[in-house]
């Protein structure tokens, strides 16, 4: 069972690793007036489900093609599942065929921070909620839209608010 989980993780990382990861990303800071949330890990454990805690706080990853928002085509807003910070509009979503919800840009206002991630022997850009510091997914520069960006987001990391 552990070998299957390890194999799944390796395949997930390979499929999301993208190409051309040598571009540098600058960390963006939050520019709107939203107050930053600071909680202990014990407080997060009480607020979040075990699955949410694993993904949002321990930087876990949904299995590909299993997330509830992967194929969602409804109009609305995607917000951080931990704090409600609005991150993406459905107009920013596209089908990247990578197995996770993908967006080509974020809502303005510095609501997402970008951090270099050196885990698993790769260099990637992790995206976290600027309001609460929760893990959302990773950012790649292989998107097919005009921005060239692909925000690869875990369904567990977001809630969807239908318009």
Model-inferred region functions:
Residues 17-46:
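Sec-dependent signal peptide cleavage junction
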């Amino acid at each position: 069972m552990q070998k299957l989980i390890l194999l799944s993780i390796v395949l997930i990382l390979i499929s999301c690793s993208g190409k051309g990861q040598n571009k540098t990303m600058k960390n963006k800071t939050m520019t709107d007036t939203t107050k930053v949330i600071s909680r202990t890990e014990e407080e997060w454990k009480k607020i979040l489900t075990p699955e949410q805690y694993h993904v949002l706080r321990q930087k876990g990853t949904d299995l590909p093609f299993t997330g509830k928002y992967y194929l969602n085509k409804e109009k609305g807003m995607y917000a951080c599942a931990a704090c409600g910070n609005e991150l993406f509009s459905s107009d920013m979503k596209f089908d990247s065929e990578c197995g996770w919800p993908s967006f080509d840009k974020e809502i303005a206002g510095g609501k997402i921070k970008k951090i270099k991630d050196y885990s698993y022997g790769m260099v990637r850009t992790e995206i976290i909620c600027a309001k609460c510091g929760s893990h959302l997914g990773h950012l790649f520069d292989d998107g097919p839209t005009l921005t060239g960006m692909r925000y690869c987001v875990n369904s567990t990391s977001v809630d969807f608010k239908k318009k």
